[in-house]
């Protein structure tokens, strides 16, 4: 275990991803908020924590509570802690994704740059504008970990599915807006590891279970323990699937407008 950790910290790619992250987001280290984030400091902590809980974002609520408990509840201190978590999560997500896909992509440059385009895109840039950016980017790291375990399950042992479900559940408890990323990336591995139509359909069902079960559990927890349930209402499966398809097209076909169309599919 110690050797593996040492190997990671000796890998130059980790530091290159770190440099890229700082170049993109370093300017946001100073205290600046999206308009919604000012609400955090304009009302009692308990009220905003309750809003997080009603939204199913238990980890976000815990983050806010811990910051207040450790006397980190001032705007500057909380923002700094959140920014550091976001930077670490962004670097870790890109590095893990790179190590997952490098065996599948012969072109080393593309194998290196694709994780950057997936993790650092127009959606994640927007997340960095919020006070709770740390937990939001942490949810992206959790989604990448979920893909990692899902890939392991398709390759070797279905027991890894439990870890994948657990990671998706934690991501739901952090920020549900990133969960579609898990489905988009995992769908590629479903295609890769399906030897026939029957296996393809079965793997898609498994993928659906890994996505839906944590969402239902998250919704159930909120429904049982909080009277008003989710602020945004119930789970809309059709809308969720539609959103996933939109994200899939944005990444696989449009390449977020950063590269020529269909390049990811060609690779």
Residue ranges and their predicted role:
Residues 91, 137-148, 164, 181:
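Alpha-helical transmembrane segments of multi-pass membrane proteins
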Residues 111-141, 145, 173:
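Aromatic- and kink-enriched transmembrane "portal" helix at the membrane-lumen/periplasm boundary
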Residues 23-90, 130-134, 168-169, 173-190, ...:
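Transmembrane catalytic cores of multi-pass membrane glycosyltransferases
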Residues 143-161, 195:
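Membrane-interface transmembrane helices that cradle and orient dolichyl/undecaprenyl
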Residues 1-23:
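Start-transfer (signal-anchor) and selected internal transmembrane alpha helices
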Residues 12-15, 51, 104-113, 157-161, ...:
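Membrane-interfacial loop-to-transmembrane alpha-helix junctions, especially the N-terminal start
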């Amino acid at each position: 275990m110690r050797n593996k950790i040492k190997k990671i910290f000796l890998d130059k790619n980790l530091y290159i991803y770190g440099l890229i992250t700082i170049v993109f987001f370093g300017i946001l280290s100073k205290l600046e908020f999206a308009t919604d984030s000012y609400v955090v400091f304009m009302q009692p902590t308990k009220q905003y924590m309750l809003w997080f809980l009603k939204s199913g974002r238990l980890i976000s609520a815990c983050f806010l509570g811990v910051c207040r408990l450790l006397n980190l509840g001032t705007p500057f201190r909380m923002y700094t802690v959140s920014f550091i978590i976001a930077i670490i999560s962004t670097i870790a997500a890109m590095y893990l994704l790179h190590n997952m896909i490098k065996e599948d992509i012969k072109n080393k440059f593309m194998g290196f740059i694709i994780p950057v385009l997936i993790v650092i895109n127009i959606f994640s840039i927007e997340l960095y504008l919020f006070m709770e950016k740390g937990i939001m980017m942490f949810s992206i790291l959790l989604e990448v970990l979920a893909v990692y375990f899902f890939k392991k399950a398709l390759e070797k042992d279905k027991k890894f599915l439990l870890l994948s479900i657990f990671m998706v559940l934690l991501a739901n408890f952090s920020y549900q807006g990133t969960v579609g990323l898990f489905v988009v990336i995992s769908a590629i591995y479903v295609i890769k590891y399906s030897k026939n139509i029957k296996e393809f359909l079965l793997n898609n069902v498994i993928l659906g279970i890994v996505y839906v079960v944590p969402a239902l559990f998250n919704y159930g927890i909120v429904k049982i323990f909080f009277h008003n349930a989710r602020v945004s209402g119930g789970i809309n499966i059709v809308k969720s699937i539609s959103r996933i398809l939109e994200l899939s097209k944005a990444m696989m076909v449009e390449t977020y407008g950063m590269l020529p169309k269909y390049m990811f599919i060609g690779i």
